[in-house]
């Protein structure tokens, strides 16, 4: 037997029924005061801590809570506030905090981008002229709160300095170490205050260590953690890595810290191999992330116990910590909120609370022997076996189709240069055609009507009539705005992935399986539990109805395979590429159905392509090849004059531009303005031969852009892209915006377009 310690790395903020989201939005809308917001969120925070305490977790994280984002929290802790928000130098107010994230009328929001290869977004620190000072030791506040209110000796959580700075802007390589030197004393101040308050452990997250970087950068970590060790020698620092294995295992495990946290789930087996090859320091704790913190499937506890037993051979007794692979921020709170799910599927699930149970079971099995948890191990064994062997997971027809993929065409009949002429001939669009990305605002009335329908309070006919009425209203609005290529608005959809999951075999929706995407925005990823198959037309009815209302082209709107995969909880018993190809074959039938019914512009969105890239560049090629294949599997069977669009967002594209071209979409639209136009520089350096729309205003902020701002974005883009290739559109879908600001922004977009179009037409003459 091995004496082990149980730990957690972070807990979902949303609450079991999204109470956190509702509290934030009530505050933003002026429905509650700041004091009421603080009271509501404190109650949620303490409830989460108490739950972990009751489940027997030894090291409970504190300070993982946030009002928006943990990286933004780090920025305001150290006073890294962009000048445009006119911060006075004191503690950052809650209003200023939210302004940085959401923008205000006279100051654009800070950039937002994906947290490594997840669907969580962080607010990018703006580090130019950074002069860090501790303005607000949030970690200390949350540590003392947990101790006072619940008697919990918590483990404060900080974003590590190297990772924080690497995630920022204005951190040029030449001056990076000098910038880091400015932050070390500020971090030391935080740690000293925690030590004085009685903290025994601090978790410092450095996921940058799990990426690919030059070995010379290890010296940055040596400098930081030596400074910390010297300043707070009695504080046990857990240096936490996750999402991948460590390229420089030997160097990392010998850094001057008390514990090293390693991901044994998303590491492709590399972590165990490194442990066997190089051993582990006798004086350190090894925090083994063995429970998957990014997926929702129940663990094979026999296999996990075997893995932990193997790991324990290399760790000093009493220094093995059992924990999830990463923060549980990325999974829903509890499966107990899903009593209506199929029994076999429910049995095979493990949300955040159940993962804590799994950690407690494994810790007890190690410490007291497997016989002490015989019933728990047998229950897990039976549940996993039942799901794997069930008809839910095994569709022989789908498996046969996958086996015969070699007979399926995955290239368009004509090359782009030839088919685009056929598309131009019938579309007859003006220079700089305008469109939107797909969704329009889902008003309280839309959400209430859908909720009433789902509860059975209104009939299918009443619901469909409402959707048609809303669609018709927005078709008319688009025509009045003079948009060139229209969309139906997606009023029937809650989410661009969940909706497809409700229509395809092999998927299962949840009621309360919500996870945070950005700010108060929560998504409810579907469960891909089995083989995926097309069973019915998904989008045809709404698209055909919208097209019947106008002579302008209306885009069919689908979500592409890789995004469906990345924004779902995917079965873990087969390779993801197999699931992506199953989705591709199913969507191919939907694309063909749209085309048969007269929809000749079809958008297949792949916004999550970039975010899903493996953290190790050595694994990129296979991922990208698989992504291109599944996309072309979806789209390649259409006629030459059918125009395929795709959309991507929140991404750096300079290193995957060849992949984007290989998708062979006729038109691609890309988020641009939230990254403050940086993507345009990519197109200044490469020749892109297909048509492209670079988003000309940020939809993630309620702020309405000016005509001048939009024109500046258009003109900047036109320095890099041929005018005849260029489309004009917002950054992303408009579902989360309010109607007045949406219409005002689109009016400005169309006005800006027409003025620039007129300038170019004069130049052409």
UniProtKB/Swiss-Prot annotation:
It catalyses: 5-methyltetrahydropteroyltri-L-glutamate + L-homocysteine = tetrahydropteroyltri-L-glutamate + L-methionine. Its EC number is 2.1.1.14. Binds 1 zinc ion per subunit. GO terms for biological process: methionine biosynthetic process; methylation. 5-methyltetrahydropteroyltri-L-glutamate binds at residues 18-21, 114, 567, 611. Catalyzes the transfer of a methyl group from 5-methyltetrahydrofolate to homocysteine resulting in methionine formation. Pathway: Amino-acid biosynthesis; L-methionine biosynthesis via de novo pathway; L-methionine from L-homocysteine (MetE route): step 1/1. It holds the Pfam family Meth_synt_1. One of its GO terms (molecular function) is 5-methyltetrahydropteroyltriglutamate-homocysteine S-methyltransferase activity. SUPFAM superfamilies: UROD/MetE-like (SSF51726). This is 5-methyltetrahydropteroyltriglutamate--homocysteine methyltransferase. It comes from Listeria monocytogenes serovar 1/2a (strain ATCC BAA-679 / EGD-e). L-methionine binds at residues 437-439, 490, 605. Its cofactor is Zn(2+). The active site is at residue 700. Belongs to the vitamin-B12 independent methionine synthase family. Keywords: Amino-acid biosynthesis, Metal-binding, Methionine biosynthesis, Methyltransferase, Repeat, Transferase, Zinc.
């Amino acid at each position: 037997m091995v004496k082990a310690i149980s730990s957690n790395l972070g807990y979902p903020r949303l609450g079991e029924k999204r109470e956190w989201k509702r509290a934030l939005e009530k505050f933003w809308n002026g429905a509650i005061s700041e004091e009421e917001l603080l009271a509501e969120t404190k109650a949620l925070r303490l409830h989460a801590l108490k739950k972990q305490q009751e489940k027997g977790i030894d090291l409970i994280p504190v300070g993982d809570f946030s009002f928006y984002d943990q990286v933004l929290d780090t920025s305001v802790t150290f006073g890294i506030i962009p000048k445009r928000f006119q911060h006075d130098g004191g503690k950052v107010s809650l209003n200023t905090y939210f302004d940085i994230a959401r923008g205000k009328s006279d100051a654009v929001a800070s950039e937002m981008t994906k947290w490594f290869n997840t669907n969580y977004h962080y607010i990018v620190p703006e580090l130019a002229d950074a002069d860090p000072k501790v303005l607000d030791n949030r970690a200390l506040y949350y540590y003392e709160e947990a101790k006072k209110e619940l008697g919990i000796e918590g483990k404060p959580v900080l974003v590590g300095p190297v990772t924080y700075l690497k995630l920022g802007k204005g951190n040029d390589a030449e001056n990076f170490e000098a910038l880091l030197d400015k932050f070390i004393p500020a971090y030391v101040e935080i740690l000293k205050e925690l030590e004085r308050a009685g903290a025994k452990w601090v978790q410092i997250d450095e996921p940058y260590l799990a990426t690919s970087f030059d070995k010379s950068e290890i010296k940055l970590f040596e400098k930081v953690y030596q400074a910390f060790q010297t300043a707070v020698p009695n504080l046990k620092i857990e240096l936490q890595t996750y999402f991948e294995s460590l390229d420089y295992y030997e160097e990392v495990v010998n850094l001057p810290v008390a514990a090293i946290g390693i991901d044994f789930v998303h590491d492709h087996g590399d972590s165990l191999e490194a442990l066997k090859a190089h051993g582990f320091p006798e004086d350190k704790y090894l925090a083994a992330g063995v429970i998957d913190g990014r997926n929702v499937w129940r663990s094979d506890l026999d296999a996990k116990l075997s893995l932990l037993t193997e790991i324990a051979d290399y760790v000093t007794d009493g220094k093995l910590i059992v924990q999830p692979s990463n923060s549980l921020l990325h999974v829903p709170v509890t499966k107990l909120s899903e009593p209506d799910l199929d029994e076999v599927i429910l049995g095979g699930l493990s949300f955040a609370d159940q993962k804590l149970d799994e950690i407690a079971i494994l810790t007890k099995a190690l410490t007291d022997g497997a016989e002490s948890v015989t019933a728990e191990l047998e229950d897990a064994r039976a549940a996993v076996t039942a799901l794997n062997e069930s008809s839910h997971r095994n569709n022989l027809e789908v498996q046969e189709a996958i086996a015969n993929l070699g007979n399926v065409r995955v290239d368009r009949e004509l090359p782009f240069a030839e088919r685009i002429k056929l598309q131009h001939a019938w579309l007859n669009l003006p220079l700089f055609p305008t469109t939107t990305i797909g969704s329009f605002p889902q008003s309280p009335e839309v959400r209430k009507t859908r909720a009433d329908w789902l509860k059975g309070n209104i009939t299918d006919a009443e619901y469909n009539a409402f959707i048609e009425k809303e669609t018709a209203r927005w078709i008319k609005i688009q025509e009045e705005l003079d948009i060139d290529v229209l969309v139906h608005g997606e009023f029937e959809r809650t989410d661009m992935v969940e909706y497809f999951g409700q229509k395809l075999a092999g998927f299962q929706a949840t009621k309360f399986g919500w996870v945070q995407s950005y700010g108060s925005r929560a998504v409810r990823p579907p469960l891909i539990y089995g083989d995926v198959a097309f069973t019915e037309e998904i989008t045809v009815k709404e698209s055909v109805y919208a097209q019947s209302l106008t002579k302008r082209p209306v885009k069919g709107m689908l979500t592409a395979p890789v995004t469906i995969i990345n924004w779902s909880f995917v079965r873990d018993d087969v390779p993801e590429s197999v699931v992506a190809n199953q989705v591709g074959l199913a969507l191919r039938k939907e694309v063909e159905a749209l085309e048969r019914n007269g929809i000749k512009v079809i958008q297949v969105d792949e916004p999550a392509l970039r975010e899903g890239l493996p953290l190790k560049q050595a694994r990129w090629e296979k991922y990208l090849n698989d992504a291109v294949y599944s996309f072309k599997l979806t789209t390649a069977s259409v006629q030459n004059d059918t125009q395929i669009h795709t959309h991507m967002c929140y991404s750096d594209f300079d290193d995957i531009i060849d992949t984007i071209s290989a998708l062979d979409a006729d038109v691609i639209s890309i988020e641009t303005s939230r990254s403050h136009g940086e993507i345009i520089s990519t197109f200044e350096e490469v020749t892109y031969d297909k048509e492209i729309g670079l988003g000309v205003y940020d939809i993630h902020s309620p702020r309405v852009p000016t005509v001048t701002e939009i024109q500046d974005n258009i003109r900047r883009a036109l320095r890099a892209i041929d005018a005849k290739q260029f489309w004009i559109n917002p950054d992303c879908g408009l579902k989360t915006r309010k109607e007045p600001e949406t219409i005002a922004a689109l009016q400005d977009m169309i006005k800006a377009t027409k003025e620039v179009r007129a300038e170019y037409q004069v130049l052409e003459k």
